Curated annotation (Swiss-Prot):
It comes from Acidovorax sp. (strain JS42). GO terms for molecular function: ATP binding; metal ion binding; methionine-tRNA ligase activity; tRNA binding. Its cofactor is Zn(2+). It is an enzyme of class 6 (ligase). This is Methionine--tRNA ligase. PANTHER family: METHIONINE--TRNA LIGASE, METHIONINE--TRNA LIGASE, CYTOPLASMIC. SUPFAM superfamilies: Anticodon-binding domain of a subclass of class I aminoacyl-tRNA synthetases (SSF47323), Methionyl-tRNA synthetase (MetRS), Zn-domain (SSF57770), Nucleic acid-binding proteins (SSF50249), Nucleotidylyl transferase (SSF52374). Binds 1 zinc ion per subunit. The keyword ATP-binding applies. Zn(2+) binds at C144, C147, C157, C160. Residues 582-688 form the tRNA-binding domain. Is required not only for elongation of protein synthesis but also for the initiation of all mRNA translation through initiator tRNA(fMet) aminoacylation. Belongs to the class-I aminoacyl-tRNA synthetase family. MetG type 1 subfamily.
């Protein structure tokens, strides 16, 4: 059989935080599938990357005092401990700000443009008047225009999975400031997903039964025609896709369009190809030749929350830019806890991957448990601590690991570590185990690891029944039964080897330890057909795995201790200590507000005309319009910084600063309070 050539990816994690258990579940699922493919002799390139672009990262980097590139690099530096910890073996890990991704994204765009799939339109776009910037989709929230779910993002609804323009939202608000955004016009670039060519292709591609699971295809089908929303309204057809964003933005510039950048969801999936190209470049291999091979298969493992981008936009981008489309999009559900409850760290139902490892919990316990749950369908899986303990302790250790421990000691001590001949009853048992190789490999192929585990555990039951029937511990006590003891124990070791091969994609570390114990090279599925044989030398058995304890599970799900809120006056720390000389540099004066008026074009500022006793007035702008009307301030005394350098503003020159008090968290503690001296103070008096 000719070896298959396969390219595999997982969804790109957004580079603004650590991995969560959902990431780890997906990576374990994909890693297991990749290992199963390699155990069939197939050539697989398995790549991942960080999704590095977008306004959220740009804003987070600014808050952290870093460049976006350094912010992403710091996040990426923490990935290895997770991947190594759970035995997840990517061939390459890159990020979407790589030179390869810039090059490929821009070329795909140009190819789509040449094919007539890109057009420009002047659109109205939301702008935050307080932050003075166009708002990215994820920083606009409001009511979904399709199903009317509240607090949905500006690009897609997490309830009904609809994709729409931010301007379609009902009652939108800025997630940055809470302000109601205003509409401003801007020229944007659109991918014409509604083009009849795209609709025809996507209809066939998503509904032909080859590329997505049936339940996913059924959901996608709703998006092509008229569909009824939960509130009774209807929506129809595929919409064109806005693929551009305005500066300031951290991303990839659109060719020949200064100040315009690709929307993150255009260049993010291209990151799959870019990470592969980066890998092949390191190896000195030709990326274009690799991708041009008609036998190449392309698989993407993703969560159900990003189906739209991977089953509509991504295949259409590839198809109409002249590239290979995915062989299959493999969609999984979410992980819940305790019979469907959403995970929550504060309630003690969150599963923190690093905490799991820090508690000394075996990563292959989790790999096995997830393997026993994942079935290749787009279904949520539930983590139940009691079920976890039972499956690990009773099944994995009690049924599988203990087979070796019940036989290996006798072989090593009584027969010098050499296997013997297997009699007819043992051969019959081993034949039954070997007969299941095809179905188990097929289960792995279908990503139905639950079936692969279930079938393997049934085989473990047969082997344990054989052990119980033949009682090697009693044979060891009987004179003249050495040959039978060696026969029975050899059968157990041969069976254990077969079972280990079946579980190897899920338990790579255990399989490696078993290979050392059996003194065999790393084995593939086909090798179950060949016995180790009489005379084969094995090593001394070392215990493979400890049992899960209740204490570990209690600690894993222990809610964090309630945070003791530090008393911070006014919501912000007292500033660092200064000297009296430092303070003396600031010239604070009593000022009279001679005139106060609103500033046209600003909702925040008031223009104050101040008498500071200089014989002439000063002009100062102050952001206090939300709390004071001009007539309320006119004639009042206040305090100003008189020696602050004048600042040129959009509305004029500001010649100082009026002092006002406010809480650091103005949303939670609204209010701005202008300082007013006691009666008797006169304009121009200095404050000491």
């Amino acid at each position: 059989m000719t070896a298959r050539k396969i390219f595999v990816t997982t969804a790109l994690p957004y580079a603004n935080g650590n991995f969560h258990i959902g990431h780890i579940m997906e990576y374990i699922q994909a890693d297991t599938w990749v290992r199963a493919q390699r155990m069939q002799g197939n050539a697989v390139n398995f790549v991942g990357a960080d999704d590095a672009h977008g306004a959220p990262i740009m804003i987070a980097a600014e808050k952290a005092g870093k460049t976006p590139q350094q912010f992403v690099a710091d996040i990426a530096a923490g990935r290895k401990q997770y991947l190594d910890g759970f035995h997840i073996a990517f061939d390459n890990w890159s990020n979407t700000d790589s030179p390869e991704n810039h090059e490929l994204s821009q070329q795909i765009y140009l190819d789509l443009k040449a094919a007539g799939f890109i057009e420009t339109r002047t659109i109205e776009q939301f702008f935050d008047p307080e932050k003075n910037m166009f708002l990215p989709d994820r920083f606009i929230k409001g009511e979904c225009p399709r199903c009317h779910a509240k607090d949905q993002y500006g690009d897609n609804c997490e309830v009904c999975s609809s994709v729409y323009a931010p301007t379609d939202l009902i009652n939108p608000y800025s997630a940055l400031s809470g302000a109601k955004p205003v509409l401003k016009t801007s020229e944007h670039f659109f991918f014409k997903l509604s083009d009849p060519r795209a609709v025809e292709f996507l209809t066939e591609w998503t509904q032909n039964g080859q590329h997505v699971q049936p339940e996913v295809a059924a959901k996608i089908k709703e998006w092509f025609g008229t569909r009824t929303n939960p509130d009774g309204t209807t929506s129809e057809g595929l919409d064109d896709w806005d693929i551009s964003r305005d500066a300031p933005y951290f991303g990839i510039e659109i060719p020949d369009a200064p100040g315009k950048y690709f929307y993150v969801w255009l260049d993010a999936p291209v990151g799959y190809l870019a990470s592969l190209k980066n890998l092949l470049n390191k190896r000195g291999e030709d990326y274009d030749a690799y991708m041009a091979d008609p036998q190449l298969e392309q698989y993407h493992f993703i969560g159900k929350d990003i189906i739209t981008f991977h089953t509509l936009f991504w295949p259409a981008m590839l198809k109409f830019s002249g590239r290979k489309t995915p062989t299959k999009i493999c969609v999984h559900g979410f992980m819940t806890v305790n019979n469907g409850e959403k995970m929550s760290k504060s309630r003690g139902t969150g599963l923190d991957p690093l905490k799991y490892l820090a508690l000394g919990m075996n990563p292959e316990w989790l790999r096995y448990y997830l393997g026993a749950k994942l079935n290749g369908k787009n279904e949520d899986i539930d983590f139940n601590p009691e079920d976890f303990m039972a499956r690990v302790n009773s099944d994995l250790i009690g049924k599988y690991v203990n087979i070796a421990s019940r036989a290996a000691g006798f072989i090593f001590k009584r027969f010098g570590g050499k296997l013997g001949e297997v009699s007819a009853d043992g051969q019959a048992l081993l034949a039954q185990l070997r007969e299941q190789a095809g179905p188990i490999v097929a289960a792995y192929e279908a990503r139905d690891t639950a079936r692969a585990v279930r079938e393997t555990m049934l085989l473990c039951d047969r082997v344990n029944s054989y052990v119980d029937a033949n009682k090697p511990w009693e044979l060891a006590k009987q004179e003249g039964m050495e040959a039978r003891l060696q026969d029975v124990c050899t059968t157990c070791i041969e069976a254990f080897r077969i079972l280990t091969i079946y579980l190897k994609p899920i338990l790579p570390q255990v399989a490696a330890e078993v290979a050392r114990f059996l003194i065999v090279p790393p084995e593939q599925f086909a090798e179950v057909a060949q016995p180790l044989g009489a005379g084969h030398q094995i090593g001394q058995y070392q215990h493979l795995m400890q049992r899960v304890t209740q204490e570990q599970l209690d600690a894993l799900f222990e809610p964090p201790a309630p945070a003791v809120e530090k008393v911070i006056p006014g919501g912000e720390e007292i500033a660092p200590t200064i000297t009296i000389d430092d303070f003396a540099k600031v010239d604070l004066r009593i000022a009279k507000i001679v005139k106060c008026e609103a500033v046209e074009g600003s909702t925040k500022l008031l223009r104050l005309t101040l008498d500071v006793g200089e014989g002439q007035t000063r002009n100062v702008f102050s952001g206090i319009a939300s709390m004071y009307k001009p007539k309320d301030l006119q004639g009042k005394l206040t305090v100003m910084v008189a020696n602050l350098a004048p600042r040129k503003m959009k509305f004029g020159l500001s010649e100082g600063m009026v002092l006002a008090a406010s809480h650091a968290d103005e949303k939670a503690h609204p209010g701005i309070f202008v300082l007013e001296p006691f009666p008797g103070a006169q304009p121009g008096m200095r404050i000491h």
